[in-house]
Amino acid sequence: PNQIWQAEQQKYPIIMNGGYFVMGAGKSVSLLCREGEVLAVNSQEEIRSQKSYYPTRGIFQLSKNGYFSTDWAYTTTDGVTYTYEQPSPNKSGYEPQPAPSAYFPTRGVKLNAETAIGGGPILLKDGSVRNTFIEELFDEESGVAPESYHPRTAIGVTANNKVIFFVCEGRSVTEGVKGMNMAMMANVLKSLGCVDAMNLDGGGSTCMLVNGQPVIKPSAGAQRAITTAVALK
């Protein structure tokens, strides 16, 4: 994030880490849409017990009419990204659901966002706690550790379309601060007035800069090189 702050000539007062990526390779495995162009997509396939699953994972988007929301999304093999009102009901260890399409798991809506970031799981949707880490295949094997305490990053929106950027420390970098799990984050974001909210990459990636200054201590002792970020202009 500090490199982004410097490269963008300090024009973003708030910068926060974004979606998931392959460490070392710099490849995003979360959706990224900027100025209406999809630059990366959410993971299209996850392998569990030698079976292929096709999860609908979360995105946080700004529509072209100026409203923020969380949605479950999937990009098909022909390159079309659809959003859905409900996630595909996958569960690791059970028979995989069909690959999402224009009509499954619900009627899909073609992504028409001004900007969007992928992550997951979705924590809140339409004012209700959802925490769909099971359906999105964000299990322990994914590395997200949804039920364990770690540094976390999330983004949400209130009923009056105000965006909430959220980070928390963890792993006892500050004595006694162990972090949060997904259930705790969902409740905290709801208490802050969010009606929609989504988890982003956490752990050693968690970082927020306000006017170039970090607001929490990184769990690894220094900022991690990340692939995507969310910034307030």
List each model region and its residues.
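Gly/Ser/Thr/Pro-rich low-complexity, intrinsically disordered segments
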Residues: 1-233
